[in-house]
Curated annotation (Swiss-Prot):
GO terms for cellular component: cytoplasm. Activates expression of the rhaBAD and rhaT operons. One of its GO terms (biological process) is positive regulation of DNA-templated transcription. PROSITE patterns: HTH_ARAC_FAMILY_2. It comes from the Bacteria. Binds DNA as a dimer. GO terms for molecular function: DNA-binding transcription factor activity; sequence-specific DNA binding. Residues 188-209, 236-259 bind DNA. This is HTH-type transcriptional activator RhaS. Its main location: cytoplasm.
Length: 268
């Protein structure tokens, strides 16, 4: 049975719209759901997040919006530190209207999570510190600060322009990989696309994800395969090819190394 976390165990009253719940570090947590929404910002470390059956690696700068009806869990954690902004109900905001539009824009799309750069993360931290310092009865100030948090995240989402400093280009590149991992990747062409030296490309992906570029792409492909194995009736060989693997035997070996279970066993 999936555990359900209740708002009454976190919020001070039914009218309180948001509350901060830091996790430093986040512990392994089994699959669960809530009767409130949650905005999660990864501050440090790494781990695997499984949202509605779809696994995804976490690393600093990842942002995701989790709705009450979603079910998710954390595993394979390595000093993972999170800032969780719990949202009791959009209707509890007195001054912010239609905030669900902003929040829904931050909802993960399977392999693709939102990313913010280091400068934005530091600015958001300063806003959250102010929220923590203000009495919860000061609704206007708190809601203004929360709106600034959402606006900052929205303003620094992925584009594939190849503009900006090295960090901005690097994060654009990672988001591109998350949306195109099933394709054959030519790393020289990708480096040129995002105006990065090839060594910088390799170094940046390694520093952000903890994996070499090719290993990171393999993990993205395996995550998509995991989801399709659990929630579709597609043939295993077809899943392997659709996710970017050219050899089904190699796919099976990689899958078992990643999830400690063979693709066929996952379907039993």
């Amino acid at each position: 049975m999936i555990q359900k976390l209740l708002a009454r165990d976190f919020f001070n009253n039914k009218e309180q719209p948001i509350i901060l719940e830091p996790r430093a570090p986040q512990e392994i947590f089994p699959e669960h759901t809530h009767d409130f929404d949650e905005l999660v910002i990864v501050k440090h470390g790494s781990g695997r997040h499984i949202l509605n059956g779809y696994p995804h690696d976490l690393y600093p700068g990842v942002v995701l919006y989790i709705q009450a009806q979603d079910h998710h869990s954390y595993e394979n954690l390595q000093d993972l530190c999170l800032t969780n902004i719990l949202i009791q109900s959009n209707n509890n905001f007195k001054y912010l209207n239609n905030i669900d539009i902003l929040l829904n824009g931050l909802k993960p799309e399977n392999s693709s999570y939102q990313l913010i750069n280091k400068k934005t993360a530091e600015y958001i931290d300063s806003l959250l510190e102010k929220i923590n310092a203000i009495d919860e009865s000061y609704n206007l100030q708190n809601e203004c600060l929360f709106f600034q948090v959402l606006s900052s995240i929205q303003a620094h989402q992925f584009n594939d322009s190849g503009y900006g400093n090295t960090e901005e280009k690097g994060r654009q590149m990672i988001r591109w990989l998350e949306n195109n991992f099933e394709k054959e990747i030519d790393w020289e062409e990708l480096a040129e696309k995002f105006a990065l030296p090839i060594r910088t490309l390799h170094r940046y992906i390694k520093s952000q994800t903890g994996h070499t570029p090719q290993n990171y792409v393999t993990k993205l492909r395996l995550a998509q395969a995991y989801y399709q194995l659990k929630y579709t009736e597609k043939n295993i060989i077809n899943i392997a090819y659709d996710c970017g693997f050219n050899d089904s035997s190699y796919f099976s070996t990689c899958f078992k190394n990643e999830y400690s279970i063979a693709p066929r066993e996952l379907r039993i």
